[in-house]
């Protein structure tokens, strides 16, 4: 995907480049990836931009609020105000809007979410699950890094479920 396609509302790109992936974690960046630098409670993602660039990031999309000094490295830097709120839409675009190709059932509440999502995914054909125990086919789950995955991870998981031929995802 081209960076301009990913960020269709940004018209000040110096160069339009091909991108191979997205990452919020500088340690997970691979060559051709875009590093997404969000403002955190203790650190800004830009604090880790140089590490991401050293691993092959070709662009950095960052939240300008609290950004501080941008490292002087000759790659594409794109400031996006309200980036955290736009992350889901950006990730969905990158992964081809996977939820548009799936029936996604969200399960909320205090108790029983894991049981309900697992039973639902096991009972229905061509189903997957995203939840506390992991994501994927109910009998072959891939562990998640966090109990509640971030918007980027959710879109990646939904895209993988779609690519596996799943029609339904039960999500805690």
Q: What label would you give each PLM region?
A:
Residues 1-89:
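N-terminal leader/targeting and accessory segments in enzymes
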Residues 86-171:
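Phosphate-binding loop of NTP-binding sites
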Residues 6-7, 44-49, 77, 110-119, ...:
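Short, mixed-charge, low-aromatic patches
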């Amino acid at each position: 995907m081209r960076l301009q396609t990913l960020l269709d509302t940004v018209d000040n790109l110096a160069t339009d480049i091909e991108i191979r992936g997205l990452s919020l974690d500088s340690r997970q960046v691979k060559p051709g990836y875009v590093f997404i630098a969000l403002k955190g409670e203790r650190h800004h993602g830009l604090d880790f931009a140089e590490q991401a660039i050293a691993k092959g990031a070709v662009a950095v999309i960052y939240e300008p609020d609290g950004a501080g000094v941008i490292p002087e490295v000759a790659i594409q830097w794109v400031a996006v105000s309200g980036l955290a709120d736009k992350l889901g839409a950006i990730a969905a675009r990158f992964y081809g809007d996977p939820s548009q190709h799936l029936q996604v059932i969200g399960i909320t509440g205090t108790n029983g979410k894991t049981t309900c999502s697992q039973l639902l995914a096991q009972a229905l054909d061509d189903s997957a699950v995203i939840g506390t125990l992991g994501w994927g086919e109910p009998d072959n789950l891939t562990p998640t890094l966090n109990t509640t995955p971030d918007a980027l991870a959710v879109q990646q998981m939904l895209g993988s479920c779609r690519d596996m031929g799943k029609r339904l995802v039960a999500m805690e």
